[in-house]
Amino acid sequence: MRMWKAVAAAVFGVALALEGADISMAAQQPDVYGRVEHGYATSEGGVKIHYAWLGPKQSAGTPLVILIHGFPDFWYSWRDQMAALSDRFQMVAIDQRGYNLSDKPKGVESYDGRLLVADVAAVIKHLGRAKATIVGHDWGGAVAWQFAMFLPQMTENLIILNLPHPSGFLRELRSNKDQIANSEYARTFQTKSASDPTVFFGKPMTPETLSSWVRDPMARKRYIEAFQRSDFEAMLNYYKRNYPASGPDAPPPAPLPKVKMPVLVFHGLADTALNADGLSGTWNWLEKDLTLVTVPGAGHFVQQDASEMVTTTMRWWLTARTTK
């Protein structure tokens, strides 16, 4: 649990402000919503995990990329990356448990980090693969860091978006006053229920408030529909189960194993929940190369705010590290 909390400490919910969202990539690419194929994998305890995929037909020779969303989100967060990269890679975006078309088990314990990692492993095995490139944003980033650390044999490469290495973030969470203040929303999520009318930054949790950050009107409509199928209490259970204490009196994190595969990190510098200071020293916790891309003007949802930069960089980086 302490190891997972070290990873989960670096997770963030929604950015309070999004500036200059770039939807040009979405405009250039055919929308994937009606083009993807859907499937379900069975995880521990019989929990069904939904995934959407696009790309070459499944085969051992096609590089597999698993995409893991954060809060509040669903598989469609990766629409631009799926559309642009599916010519070369099998792009598989999951709905994390509690969201959209995946199962929504009851109880805080059902959202323990170990189970979230098991969900990703279940999808890879269901697809008949031994390993994949793991991509994660926000809570998906926490799961991705954890997956890479403890299932390195299943991790080809690691791509993280707006989520520092847990050791870097915990350092800031214990000593950086700005970061501590920026993380106060997580305490609200831990102490209130989804039915509280002020739980979501002073507003109720509704499909409309949860999707208010989405700029594209058609995408927002699909987010509202996905959140109508989601469990709001389950969303908060991620925080209740896994988010650790902050401040100088917080217990130090347990040691974490070094990440053994190449890592690509994107960070939108306008993220109002996450200080970029947490990125410092990332290289100390990795065994292989780190590529760090900071994006001025992009916020927490960097894969959408700067989708063209993210997608172009992913293609270059993955092509250099994968073979057909």
Predicted feature residues:
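Bacterial N-terminal signal peptides
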Residues: 8-19
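Boundary at the C-terminal end of the N-terminal hydrophobic targeting segment
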Residues: 20, 24-27
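Flexible "cap/lid" subdomain of the alpha/beta-hydrolase fold that forms the substrate-access gate
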Residues: 28-39, 47-49, 54-59, 64, ...
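Structural cue for short, hydrophobic secondary-structure segments
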Residues: 67-70, 93
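Serine-hydrolase catalytic-loop signature spanning alpha/beta hydrolases and amidase-signature enzymes
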Residues: 72-80, 91
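A short, Lys/Arg-enriched amphipathic alpha-helix followed by its capping loop at the start of a domain
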Residues: 81-89, 126
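Catalytic histidine-centered segment of alpha/beta-hydrolase-like enzymes
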Residues: 298-307, 311
